[in-house]
Design a protein with these regions (language model features):
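H-loop/switch region of ABC-family ATPase nucleotide-binding domains
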Residues: 187-188
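Helix-to-loop junction immediately C-terminal to a conserved catalytic motif
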Residues: 51
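Conserved ABC ATPase signature
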Residues: 127-131
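Conserved ABC ATPase "signature" region
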Residues: 105-123
Length: 247
């Protein structure tokens, strides 16, 4: 299987403290890959590094995608900005018409279709600050739909979301895979990862394992990830962190 992303000796630091440390791994193309690991393992930082949004990046990132769509955690989005559902979704075409250009009829048509696809017909003129968490996540997925990207990066897309919305959004993710798009998702729910994601990358600032989900999420690997994360907490400035596994 070809790789959509190749990471070689990738290190990402904040104030000289490594959040991702000497990571070498591949993300398969046209596949659904979950990035998992303990809290503070560098999962969200890794997504930002792939976009060039993280400071102090060392190593090599090779990406075959022509277009990349990114969905951050909702906590990072200011919902107080006075904007409608329709205009929020239309921002998915921002790179095509820019700040001073006008959306074309095809963009308006596609935005309407994307809103229908996420089950929000009739919400087009609603201000985003009047939506529930689940409704707003549907809006953000509609915006991703409009970007028509080869590589889709989603950071905790199901946090605090109702089960019906999770199921509906998973249908979209599976559709992207069927369309040969690469989807990389940061998740905490390991049961969902085992059920829905064929590929996984287990991170504890350093790579624990990457590959088929059943192998990556073995009991031994999860124990090792926890031990590595605890060791990093004790040795935040160290380049080589001792890891002691319980017998």
């Amino acid at each position: 299987m070809s790789a959509a992303l190749r990471l070689t000796n990738l290190t990402v630091s904040y104030d000289r403290h490594p959040a991702v440390h000497h990571l070498t791994a591949e993300i398969p193309a046209a596949e659904m890959t979950a990035i998992v690991g303990p809290n503070g393992a560098g999962k969200s930082t890794l997504l930002k590094a792939l976009l060039g949004l993280a400071p102090h990046i060392e190593g090599r990132i090779e990406c075959t995608a022509r277009r990349i769509a990114y969905l951050p955690q909702q906590a990072e989005i200011d919902r107080s900005f006075p904007i409608s559902v329709f205009d929020t979704v239309l921002l998915g075409r921002w790179s095509r018409f820019g700040g001073f250009g006008a959306a074309k009829p095809v963009d308006l048509h596609d935005a309407k279709h994307a809103i229908e696809a996420v089950g929000l017909s009739g919400f087009e003129r609603r201000p985003i600050d009047t939506l529930s968490v689940g409704q707003f996540q549907r809006v953000l997925f509609a915006r991703v739909l409009l970007q028509d990207a080869d590589l889709v990066l989603l950071d905790e897309p199901f946090a605090a979301i109702d089960s019906k919305t999770v199921a509906d959004l998973m249908v979209l993710i599976q559709r992207w895979r069927a369309e040969q798009r690469t989807v990389v998702v940061v998740l905490h729910d390991l049961d969902q990862v085992r059920r829905d994601f064929p590929s996984a990358l287990l991170l504890a600032r350093e790579l624990v394992d990457a590959g088929p989900t059943a192998r990556v999420l073995s009991a031994d690997n999860l124990l090792r990830a926890r031990a590595m994360a605890e060791a990093w907490d004790e040795h935040a400035d160290a380049c080589e962190v001792p890891v002691r596994l319980s017998a």
